[in-house]
């Protein structure tokens, strides 16, 4: 299950939000969740939440039923967010749900795309041999994406070596 929330925020004193607010919003969300789940969600190996700011719209992707329930219950009732003595109003919110992997795959087929584009909307780090990679290679990006997919949809594991090599060969940075 993938649930995407889009919250249109009115910044402090009506000012536009810069991307630097994204991590503070993420920290605020973790503070609203039960402590054990917040710690679980924050660990690097868990891929249950991704978020970024797109202008004044806070976009959150909740991956898996538990994240959707825990964080969704917080986001559904949020009207105001107070951060560092700054108050933000939620002007609008919407939610999209992809319940089953088949829905996700069928949506991709509907787009009739020969290419896909991946944008990193917030700082992204990759690790190799226990160290952060300054410049991630296509293999690290693909490995991260597939690990997230396999964690979310274990019934559709993507681990065929030939497929991975073909995907890696077709990725350009």
Locations of the language-model features?
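RNA-interacting cores
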Residues: 1-173
């Amino acid at each position: 299950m993938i649930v995407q929330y889009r919250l249109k925020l009115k910044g402090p004193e009506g000012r536009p939000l810069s991307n630097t607010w994204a991590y503070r919003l993420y920290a605020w969300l973790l503070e609203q969740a039960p402590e054990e789940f917040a710690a679980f969600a924050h660990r690097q190996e868990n891929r249950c939440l991704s978020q970024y700011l797109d202008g004044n719209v806070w976009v959150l992707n909740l991956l898996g039923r538990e994240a959707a329930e825990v964080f969704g219950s917080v986001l559904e009732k949020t009207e105001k967010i107070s951060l560092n003595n700054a108050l933000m109003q939620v002007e609008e919110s919407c939610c999209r749900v992809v319940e089953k992997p088949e829905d996700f795959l069928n949506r991709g087929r509907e787009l009739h795309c020969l290419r896909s584009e991946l944008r990193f909307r917030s700082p992204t780090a990759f690790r190799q041999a226990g160290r952060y990679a300054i410049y991630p290679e296509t293999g690290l990006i693909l490995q991260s994406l597939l690990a997230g997919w396999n964690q979310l949809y274990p019934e559709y594991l993507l681990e065929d070596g030939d497929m991975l090599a073909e995907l890696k060969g077709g990725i350009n940075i």
